[in-house]
Amino acid sequence: MSLASLETTINGAFDARETVTAATKGEVREAVDHALDLLDKGEVRVAERAADGKWTVNQWLKKAVLLSFRLNDMSVIPGGPGKAVWWDKVPSKFEGWDENRFRDAGFRAVPGAIVRRSAYIAKNAVLMPSFVNLGAYVDESTMVDTWCTVGSCAQIGKRVHISGGAGIGGVLEPLQAGPVIIEDDCFIGARSEVAEGVIVRKGAVLSMGVFLGASTKIVDRETGEIFMGEVPEYAVVVPGALPGKPLKNGQPGPSTACAVIVKRVDERTRSKTGINELLRD
């Protein structure tokens, strides 16, 4: 089935999604399964970057992910600690994999790393004990550190470091129009959160504890320019606060959290945030 045919079938099924159930067979199930398989292999992705830097969201692929929850029934998923099991609709990406399959895939998955089927992991990536949700795309030589979450359909570029405990938001709940996008060579500091379709542009650095949503103000300390929904290329961002409006009694009001661009990436920053190739051999 061609991509155009897949898109047409999936869009039609999504419009009539109330009729799609675990009993649905035929063209709709085949189209959704095929789309998820393509996502799993990295042959298609939920969002794609054009030469001019603009990202296009393939909404039909996001719809395929959503439809899979209506098509698939709950089942036992083995592999829990102490021979325990899980109960879910989405199998592990690694179900049935052997040594040869992992060698061909070319990435590292440390015990405790959970990746759901339809997420793509590129060569030389490293997955510490973490969670990568369905439809996500993790590109080459990226490190997903311990206790990180990569949300549904999130797009992570090459040579990205997502530090311990950081969260990259998904698109499924609450439903978002576009996924979070982390472009190449970015550094996401420990315990930071990027959600609601925010785009972190190439080479940007978020320090520890930066929280970014679609409405978070990102203030350039040098120019006063305010960004929302997008971190500029090579920006170094730290947590900050904006002064609040005075209260009715004239006293200072509570401040509002923001993010602050303190500088652009320089050699000193690169030396602190560069990836270690030894970990990716």
Swiss-Prot record:
Q: Which UniProt keywords apply?
A: Acyltransferase, Amino-acid biosynthesis, Cytoplasm, Diaminopimelate biosynthesis, Lysine biosynthesis, Repeat, Transferase
Q: In which pathway does it act?
A: Amino-acid biosynthesis; L-lysine biosynthesis via DAP pathway; LL-2,6-diaminopimelate from (S)-tetrahydrodipicolinate (succinylase route): step 1/3
A Gene Ontology biological process noted in the UniProt record is: lysine biosynthetic process via diaminopimelate
Does the keyword Amino-acid biosynthesis feature in the UniProt annotation? yes
**Could you tell me which Gene3D superfamilies the record lists for this protein?**
Hexapeptide repeat proteins, Tetrahydrodipicolinate-N-succinyltransferase, N-terminal domain
Q: Does the keyword Acyltransferase apply?
A: yes
The record ties this protein, via InterPro entries, to: DapD_Trfase_Hexpep_rpt_fam, Hexapep, THP_succinylTrfase_dom1, THP_succinylTrfase_N_sf, Trimer_LpxA-like_sf
Summary of subunit composition and partner proteins: Homotrimer.
- In Swiss-Prot or TrEMBL terms, this protein is called 2,3,4,5-tetrahydropyridine-2,6-dicarboxylate N-succinyltransferase
Q: Which organism is it from?
A: Nitrobacter hamburgensis (strain DSM 10229 / NCIMB 13809 / X14)
